[in-house]
């Protein structure tokens, strides 16, 4: 039944919210995988730059460059959205996550590390506002705060903890190259899940719409 004007929107539990928006569940999974890669690469950055033959000074410069480039990306996000859909921006940032960690994996000099750090503009700089806009556009008004909280838990909580723990264990056993290969796998999986979440594959998009409609009818 249509909602009466002035009526308070229905506030769902976490489980109800995830059932109602199955594509949002995929977005959460993509966020967790991508942030597992991003957070662990920041945590163990000193090992990455040492692999490239540098030290803590170069690490600080690379991290500063990456952090500096996040701000203009966030500031220009609204202009980007005028040219590209939100779905394409999410795919772009997922691709940047993968490209950056692949360059880290292959890097043999600090030049490559610095070039990879430039990708932070398209990576985390777009990721943060894009996920906020996704919730605003796809989650009903009464549950947007809960949606934002779930994204924070999936990315900064589950993803970061999973990535740091696994990469720490792999670093001890397989070295920096093994750790970076694991991060590449996480980023690649995150890209695939992001494509599914944003409806890139038509057959999957149709199935998601059917699931969402069934969930709405059951609430």
Residue ranges: model-predicted function:
Residues 40-59:
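Short amphipathic helix-loop junctions that connect adjacent transmembrane helices
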Residues 126-140:
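Intracellular juxtamembrane helix-capping segments at the cytosolic ends
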Residues 72-86, 171-172:
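Helix-to-loop junctions at the C-terminal end of transmembrane segments
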Residues 1-28, 218:
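Juxtamembrane intracellular "pre-TM" segments in multi-pass secondary transporters
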Residues 88-103, 184:
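Structural signature of the two symmetry-related core transmembrane helices
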Residues 168-189:
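A membrane-interface helix-boundary motif in multi-pass transporters
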Residues 105-116:
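Helix-loop junctions at membrane interfaces in 12-TM secondary transporters
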Residues 19-41, 118-122:
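Pair of pore-lining "gating" transmembrane helices in MFS-fold secondary transporters
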């Amino acid at each position: 039944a249509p909602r009466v004007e002035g009526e308070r929107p229905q506030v769902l539990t976490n489980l109800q919210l995830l059932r109602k928006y199955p594509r949002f569940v995929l977005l959460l999974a993509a966020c967790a995988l991508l942030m597992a890669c991003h957070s662990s690469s920041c945590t163990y950055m000193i090992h990455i730059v040492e692999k490239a033959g540098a030290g803590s000074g170069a690490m600080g410069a690379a991290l500063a460059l990456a952090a500096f480039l996040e701000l203009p990306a966030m500031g220009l996000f609204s202009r980007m959205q005028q040219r590209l859909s939100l779905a394409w921006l999410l795919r772009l940032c997922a691709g940047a996550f993968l490209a950056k960690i692949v360059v880290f994996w292959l890097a043999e000099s600090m030049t490559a590390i610095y070039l990879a750090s430039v990708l932070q503009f398209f990576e985390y700089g777009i990721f943060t506002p894009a996920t906020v806009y996704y919730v605003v556009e796809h989650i009903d008004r009464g549950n947007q705060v809960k949606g934002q909280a779930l994204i924070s838990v999936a990315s900064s909580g589950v993803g970061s903890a999973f990535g740091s723990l696994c990469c720490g264990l792999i670093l001890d056993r397989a070295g920096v190259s093994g750790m970076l290969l694991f991060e590449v796998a996480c980023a690649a999986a995150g890209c695939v899940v992001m494509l599914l979440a944003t409806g890139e594959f038509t057959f999957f998009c149709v199935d998601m719409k059917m699931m969402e409609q069934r969930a709405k009818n059951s609430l």
